[in-house]
Regions:
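Glycine-rich dinucleotide-binding loop and its adjacent helix/turn
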Residues: 13, 18-76, 171-173
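Structural signature of beta-strand start/N-cap positions in the alpha/beta core
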Residues: 12, 56-58, 79, 112, ...
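Hydrophobic/aromatic beta-strand patches that form the interior of the parallel beta-sheet core
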Residues: 15, 36, 58, 81-83, ...
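Rossmann-like dinucleotide-binding cores of NAD(P)H-dependent redox enzymes
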Residues: 45, 56, 64-123
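Glycine/Thr-rich phosphate-binding loops of Rossmann-like dinucleotide-binding domains
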Residues: 24-25, 67-68, 91, 142, ...
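Conserved beta-strand-loop-beta-strand element in the redox core of flavoprotein oxidoreductases
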Residues: 1-9, 123-139
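Conserved beta-strand segments of alpha/beta enzyme cores
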Residues: 8, 34, 79, 112-113, ...
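FAD-site-proximal beta/loop scaffold in flavoenzymes
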Residues: 31-53, 131-133, 138-189
């Protein structure tokens, strides 16, 4: 690896694997205390502090990551409600039948699951708890709200580079970008 006078590094092949970051949905109240994504160690520690047995927890998102979080929360014996905008759980990976099987399994374990449902807003309630308003008219009490509503690829730094991007770096079936010898892998694609 050699650097030129501008600090650029020469390469034979380049792999871009800069990952992604959590996306916060455009919901009133997302900035309130007690609402966390589950992305960093600090997020995890904050969740553990509030996810005590018997705590009311609302999990927004029932995708792949949301279901991993769901499993961990269920083991902590919280009162868990999952809200998923799509018509089934794990909608990007499962068909209707499989998504409904996961939903039934969760409900058999005592998890409340709302599919085809959106969070319209979150407000502070008395005593530091939260009120989560759903688009179906229901309001949920929550000690903790976790947002697992998706991620966005870390591609901002590629603007003007000539690499073709959409919601991530565009690659072929061999993970090659439109520029020879530049590849991308993981959440950045």
């Amino acid at each position: 690896n050699k650097k030129d006078n501008n600090g650029a590094i020469e390469y034979d092949k380049l792999l871009i694997a800069t990952g992604s970051h959590p996306v916060s949905p455009p919901i009133d109240g997302m900035e309130l205390s007690g609402i966390h994504s589950c992305w960093t160690l600090e997020d995890g520690r904050n969740i553990v502090k509030r996810a005590k047995p018997g705590a009311n927890v609302v999990l927004m998102g029932a995708g792949f990551i949301g279901c991993i979080i769901l499993e961990a929360l269920a083991l902590r014996k919280v009162n868990l409600t999952v809200i998923e905008m799509d018509d089934r759980m794990v909608p990007r990976m499962m068909d209707q039948n499989a998504g409904n099987l996961i939903k039934s399994w969760c409900m058999d374990k005592g998890v409340n699951v709302h599919t085809s449902t959106r969070v319209d807003g979150i407000e502070k309630a008395d005593g530091g708890a939260l009120k989560v308003r759903l688009n179906n008219g229901e309001t949920l009490d929550a000690d903790l709200v976790i947002s697992a509503t998706g991620v966005a690829a870390n591609i901002q730094f590629l603007e003007g580079s000539g690499l073709e991007t959409d919601f991530g770096v565009l690659v072929n079936d061999r993970l090659q970008s439109n520029i020879p010898d530049i590849y991308a892998a993981g959440d950045v694609c």
